Swiss-Prot record:
Effect of gene knockout: Abolishes localization of hop1 to DNA double-strand break (DSB) hotspots.
GO cellular component: chromosome; nucleus
Organism: Schizosaccharomyces pombe (strain 972 / ATCC 24843) (Fission yeast)
Protein's cellular compartments: Nucleus; Chromosome
Protein name per Swiss-Prot or TrEMBL: Meiotic recombination protein rec15
Cysteines engaged in disulfide bonds, as pairs: none
Amino acid sequence: MSYSVSAAQLWSRKLAMQAEDMQQHQKSQSNQIASCLAEMNTKQEVVNQTIGQLGRSISEVQQQNSQLVLQSLNQINMSMQQVALGIQDYASRINKLEQTMSDMNLKFEALQKEQNSNTKTLADCTSQMTIITKKLDAELKKRYMTTKQTRTVQNQTMPRSNTTTKKRVLAIDFLADDDY
């Protein structure tokens, strides 16, 4: 029996060694699983942090984009208002300019009518002056002829100078022009 005890001992030792090997194997597998789980947890935390950072970044970018869009829309709105005001100002200036032009056209037409009437008046005055000048010339010739024919002997000895006669003719013309 000692052989069988020894076989039983061997067998129990073998089983104990196998159990110990299995325990160590399970322990190493448990350690590997624990380290794998720890690594997965750390990686999950990194992923969660990255996802959180990405989420925050996305929300920040969305906020910035929405702010930029709002600012751009406000600037466009202000620009449109300025353009509208500019157009209104331009339209009022054009209206004033058109009004000024129509006023100037009316004044120009009035000036043309006045000029036409003045031209007619001037033409009438010129024709009247021509008639008056012809009459005066005729009267002067008559006077000159009568004065020459009725000269006395004393006057004939002292002939008049040309300048005195010219002065008299100019004086008569001057008086005729002023309607004296």
